[in-house]
UniProtKB/Swiss-Prot annotation:
The keyword Ribonucleoprotein applies. NCBIfam families: PRK00132.1 (NF001099). Keywords: Ribonucleoprotein, Ribosomal protein. It comes from the Bacteria. Belongs to the universal ribosomal protein uS9 family. GO terms for biological process: translation. This is Small ribosomal subunit protein uS9. GO terms for molecular function: RNA binding; structural constituent of ribosome. The gene is rpsI. GO terms for cellular component: cytosolic small ribosomal subunit.
Length: 130
């Protein structure tokens, strides 16, 4: 018996997530742990749930996500994008509401590299006129 599932990939900063959406009762599992156990901060958990709330599908799907790289916020953003893409794969009519909420756009901001001669990416040493 083959179970139907939808797949979405998400990336944010240096984090990447593979998200599988299956019909269920609303369980969210990240790297084998429940959502509340994996993310300590409530804001990260809220970010992950946002696409399901917009689609009003909070308790219709089980979400299985594997993430790698980055920190907690980057991984949460990557999972959010993956869930949104999987929901659109499941129901194409959700694309408009997902785009309006900003969940279909990959956040392209990356860390700027440190330059030689500067203390950080843009921070120079203090300038002394005399």
């Amino acid at each position: 018996m083959a179970t139907t599932q939808n797949y979405g990939t998400g990336r944010r900063k240096t984090a990447s997530a593979r998200v599988f959406l299956r019909p269920g009762k609303g369980d969210i599992v990240v790297n084998g742990k429940p959502l509340d156990a994996y993310f300590g901060r409530e804001t990260s958990r809220m970010v992950v749930r946002q696409p399901l709330e917009v689609a009003q599908a909070g308790n219709r799907f089980d979400v299985f996500a594997t993430t790698a790289g980055g920190g907690a916020n980057g991984q949460a953003g990557a999972i959010r994008l993956g869930i949104a893409r999987a929901l659109v794969e499941y129901d194409e009519t959700l694309r408009g509401s997902m785009r309006a909420a900003g969940f279909m756009t990959r956040d392209a901001r990356e860390v700027e590299r440190k330059k030689v001669g500067l203390r950080k990416a843009r921070r120079a040493t203090q300038f002394s006129k005399r």
